[in-house]
Amino acid sequence: MLKKYSWKVLSVVMLLLNAWWIFQTFQYDHYQEPLGKITMVKKVEKTDTVDEHQNKDIISTQQIHLTLLSTENKGKELTILNKFSQSRIKDQEYKIGDLVFLSIKDNDFSQATIIDSKRDTGLAILMLGFVLLLIVIGRKSGVASLIGLLINTGLFYLLLILYEHVSSQSLIWLSLLFFPIIVTSTLIVSNGWNQKTKISILTTLCSTLITFVLGVSIITLLKHKGLRYEEMELITRPQHVLFISSLLIGTMGASMDISITLSTAMNEIAQRHKQLTPQSLYQSGIQVGSEVIGPMINIMFFSYLSGSIPLILIFLRNDMSFNYTFPISLSLEMTRALIGSIGIILTIPITSYIASIFLTRGNQHER
């Protein structure tokens, strides 16, 4: 897909853009909120607290001295009190050298408060490391992956923009419209337009649609029983519509991953063994799929469930029962993981069957 030198040019452009982003994070006057740098910290008070569940915590008070780095009052020294708990659930402790965003109303510096830490510099450096490693290790494939990521980000942003101007119930149809575009663009950019890509696109579309229809049908027949939408209670759009749309996106990612892995392996087998019959190649595909299905499903479950660990610990720490904690915090994630895993399982025979037909078509004519 990428010519001999074009990927090197694109690599340099991406690295320069990332370096420019890092440079911009040090241009403090570009931020809307006033920015300050902490120069001295002193703990002035510490109080033990116990809540109604006998959970113990310690509330500490810091006296923070900082210097303004932006606005017309740049260089002005401020002193602010900051309270933080030992648990750090809703607050945090600040240290010397931290950069923080401030809230200053009507230039009343005596009432200034800290909004949050400035973290974008670290994020930009982390992104630079990600891009650099992807280019160094992946080379042309790495650059293609970055381009695909940018295209998909743009498509997803366009999807959200369109959703703002249509009815609340239309997100599912918009997702169904965009998902073949995302699949096609991702695979073509990553692998070029070839037999392997055609197989991957076709099998991803088939397995994703079958899994999505199966999952939505079961959820609808059960009338959404067992699904706890409390974690989405602040959303003003229909929660079940957003959840069902997320099922499509998650299933698409899982199916695409296993499909390209399997079609690549089967294409390699077909290239090395020209006389393979469709049945033999199909069995080879099933065997390869059985080797990767375990790790793929584990990745699916851990990636979905890991995000709920903090909420589970908070609930259990506050004497919530297991019977209450796990359904309310894991029902949606578990459903996403289960349906995504079904997609992985179905993708293996679908990809093996379609690939065995496409990749042995010439062999049958020769015989």
Which positions does each model-derived feature cover?
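Membrane-cytosol interface segments
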Residues: L35-Y94
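Hydrophobic secretory-pathway targeting helix
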Residues: M1-L35
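Helical hairpin unit composed of two closely spaced alpha helices linked by a short loop
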Residues: D257, M266-I312
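Membrane-interface helix termini and inter-helical loops of multi-pass transporters
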Residues: L81, F109-T113, K223-E233, F322-T325
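Extended, hydrophilic extramembrane loops/domains of integral membrane proteins
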Residues: S85-T121
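Short juxtamembrane and helix-loop transition motifs at transmembrane-helix boundaries
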Residues: L102-I115, F130-G142, I161-S167, E268
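Hydrophobic alpha-helical transmembrane segments of membrane transport and translocation systems
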Residues: Q287, E291-G294, F302-R367
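Transmembrane alpha-helical segments that form the functional core of multipass membrane systems
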Residues: G129-V131, K140-G250, A254
